[in-house]
Amino acid sequence: MRTFRNCSHPLLAAAMLFASMAAFAAELPLGPMPISLKYLPVPPVPGLADGSDPIVVNKPAAIALGKALFWDSNVGSDGMACASCHFQAGADGRSKNQISAGGQSKPVAEQIFADSSDATPLGPNRTLSLADFPLHQRLDPLADSAVVFDTDNVVGSAGTFAGEFKGVNRFTSGTDICNRAADPVFRVGANGTRRVTPRNAPTVINAVFNHRSFWDGRANNVFNGSSPWGDRDPDAGVWVKTGPRNVQKQRLHLINSSLASLAVAPPANHTEMSCSNRSLLDVGRKLLYRAPLQNQLVHHADSVLGPYSNSNPEKLNPGLNLPYGSLVRQAFNAKYWSYSGSVPLAVPAGQAPYTQLEANFPMFFALAIQLYESTLISDQAPFDNSARDANHQPVDLSAAELNGLKQFRKNQCALCHLGPNFSSASIAANAAIAQSHPEAFGEPTFRISASSNVVNRIPLLVGGLPVTAFYDTGFSSNGASREANDIGAGSVDDFGNPLSFSLQYLQLLAGNSAAVQDSEVNAVRACDFQDAVATNLKLPYSLPNLFTQIDGLMPQPQSTANCFLPLVNAFLPTPAAAAAELNKAVNRKMVAAVTATFKTPSLRNIELTGPYMHNGSMATLEQVVEFYSRGGNFKNDSKHVTRVFPQPTLQTDAQNRADLVAFLKTLTDDRVRYQRAPFDHPELKIPHGHSGDEVATVAGNPLNASLSKDEYLRLSAVGAEGAAEPLPAFEQRLAP
């Protein structure tokens, strides 16, 4: 629902919002007009490949390294590549053995596989069918009607068998030495199956625009060289050669690098890719001395890897023509790999000390993958390529698609799926074009704040009370699942600190600056909130949702240039006023709505990236539109009820719903659909369930006799010109 920039009284604004929610039949103003992705700048990473002493000295070599690492099944302990969960338009389109028993926040004791809506086992090794979706079903899918089926099970991504890591082979075997056995949760009878993640795998295409990565934002905007946690990790750093006989561990601080922060996590995760207790240093020891993609065909016309391939027009061959270590040396500054001695790091018993090349492998791996993924920008969809009229309408779309765009703007979709990437999580990129393309963020009478603020404020209902709550920019709760199943950005990092920027910001306002873990929280400007936190108007009374002079105010410490709100709102509560409000039994001014909030995904290529939502609970775009038409599934406290509520123009008009889906399909880039450069790739053999079904599997996996035999989905090597056949949508991959 809308907030109005010219309305300085928060109670009036809230009244307008909640009244208009009730008046469903009323005509709503249109939201922001999306624009082409061609206008969106990639957020810069100072110091990565620029300046007098860059980290990357050969960017094309680094991109080649990143692409090889992303697609190489030797990265995993038992055949999982990064691409194994991101092969279908950057997402995961598998349909067998994709079910996890409960969300990310479910205790192990409560992780129980349910039955499907037809009472058959919805568990390990099931082949999903269209009838299994959605995972929450209503008697009338367009209305807040009786629930006829619900499960907390998640459609995630099948990964590894796990097991206790023991060692690697440096040259030949792609599987690690691990003590493996049947998993206590992921099994069919006595036979172990591959584990499945408790969240759906989002696309990596256009992910370079995200300020943070992962659904919960735990992949920090700052890359520290060795972990996902940015400046939060006190032990992070990289090894730098400072002299012929000296190497020193130094801190690294690369902004706009959440893709690098993300990249270091899956290869060490014992559900996604790894045996337990394996580090990225072990992965480096395994890979650096062998050829990239040594068991996978590489197309001679691959847009990146072609010059390094062993293939020719007559025959495709596996691997590249140089080892990983050589690519690293070509791509990265010598001070990160040229030290000839060992680094002072603890090593497992009986193993040789780590070289500098091995010790810095997490940095090489992460930055190379980030640079590769930064090339995966799909800005040539029909929506992008259309001419525009004076009102910025894409005139080359059909009448149905244009009506779908109107429905997209009218039914609150554009408030979260904002800007050229259709995501408010693209913070820096959206802020960079807010002045040059204001139409992307609303009309003069109603506009969405598109600043560099990582915290924002909107009216919500929390605990039944109307409040103006803080939330993390680019994160929201739409009520897709119960709050207890997965608390999303309301969780904490490995050190016990909140992931949420909003929770840190509350502590900052209350005078506890030591609680701030992420430096961008200190830069949040009060005058750039969607709805104000304070007003400096001389009012003779206090307000329930807004700090006033009576409470105690101080000017915001940052500049007031180009503020979104009037300058009377460029104020903050004093620390004493903020702390007093936090300590109240009923707090309405210092509320953070972050529990069960998740990163707003891009809608680009959305027809190819199902299943949908963080829990993979919907198979088709039609099911997604039904979900939003009825206003979601659950009424969580952090739910954005002023944006997700029943939409009468969709509930009552099947043509509007069909047209909205038609518009969403104009966001598909045919280069993605046909796997053309830069979306071409090597061959990949992807684990896709096991021999048998959800009732019985065939044991005798070569890794361990107690494990089920793998089945595979084989992806052929594709060159720059792409494939002859288009990628199918997720529902087309499902069983009848």
Cite the ranges covered by each PLM segment:
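Periplasmic c-type cytochrome electron-transfer domains
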Residues: 3, 24-736
